[in-house]
């Protein structure tokens, strides 16, 4: 009667975090109802450029990924000061954006240098991190779409993602990131076998890529984020 269905968890809204949490009992809803519920959640999401003063809030999101997952190969949680410096350094050339729900930052994304040689100027590496309690709500997709719009304004062409890829998913890593990037239009272009060691395990690392513009002769010069920052206000 309703077409495709999906098993989902009963959910409860958490006023403190501004996110939806699964309860214990599972229910089955038609896919259109699931998408409707996601739409309600996403209605209250706003995007803005990150500020150095956001460092402590962003670090609260990032720290669990360092401590509990192999999504990042970083071993130690950086200090707030170091994280603030990372934001400042990124914003000198590339976008760094945050997603906000009910006045709380629930995710962030940023671009970084792919390689330092001049010929790589049209390439960036993207990263996205979400509050652990706010995953699978469409926030990552929204952040990536906004990033693509901003990077296109900068004349960036190639988007790259470096992703931990387990031969067998374990408690520290799944293949969710690879699947997410595939849904966002990224293609697998390379695998480095057992290139990262964390939690007493060797993990593969893969690269995925997406072109957001044509590869023309004499491409327009890349603009820094400060040069186009004012223009980004119209897409937030």
Which stretches of residues belong to each language-model region?
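A short beta-loop-alpha structural element at the N-terminal edge
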Residues: 46-58
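Conserved GNAT-fold acetyl-CoA-binding loop/helix
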Residues: 59-86
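Acetyl-CoA-dependent GNAT
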Residues: 78-133, 145, 150, 154, ...
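Conserved catalytic-core motifs of GNAT/GCN5-like acyltransferases
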Residues: 110, 162-164, 178, 182-201, ...
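A short, internal acetyl-CoA/4′-phosphopantetheine-binding micro-motif in the GNAT/acyltransferase core
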Residues: 127-135, 163-168
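Conserved GNAT acetyl-CoA-binding A-motif
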Residues: 151-173
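C-terminal "cap" of GNAT-fold acetyltransferases
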Residues: 194-236
């Amino acid at each position: 009667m309703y077409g495709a269905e999906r098993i989902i968890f009963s959910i409860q809204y958490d006023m403190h975090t501004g996110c939806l949490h699964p309860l214990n009992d599972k229910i089955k809803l038609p896919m259109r109802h699931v998408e409707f519920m996601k739409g309600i959640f996403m209605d209250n999401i706003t995007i803005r450029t990150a500020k150095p003063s956001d460092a402590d809030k962003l670090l609260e999101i990032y720290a669990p990924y360092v401590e509990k997952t192999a999504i990042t190969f970083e071993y130690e949680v950086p200090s707030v000061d170091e994280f603030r410096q990372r934001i400042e350094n990124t914003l000198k050339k590339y976008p760094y954006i945050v997603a906000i729900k009910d006045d709380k930052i629930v995710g962030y994304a940023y671009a970084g240098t792919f390689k330092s040689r001049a010929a790589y100027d049209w390439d960036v590496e993207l990263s996205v991190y979400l509050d652990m309690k706010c995953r699978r709500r469409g926030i990552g997709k929204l952040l990536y779409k906004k990033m693509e719009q901003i990077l296109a304004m900068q004349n960036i062409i190639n988007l790259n993602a470096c992703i931990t890829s387990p031969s067998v998913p374990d408690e520290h890593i799944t293949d969710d990131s690879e699947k997410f990037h595939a849904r966002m239009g990224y293609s697998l272009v390379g695998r480095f076998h057992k290139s990262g060691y964390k939690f007493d395990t060797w993990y593969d690392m893969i690269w995925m890529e997406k072109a957001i513009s044509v590869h023309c002769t004499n491409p327009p010069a890349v603009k820094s984020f400060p040069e186009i920052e004012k223009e980004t206000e119209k897409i937030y």
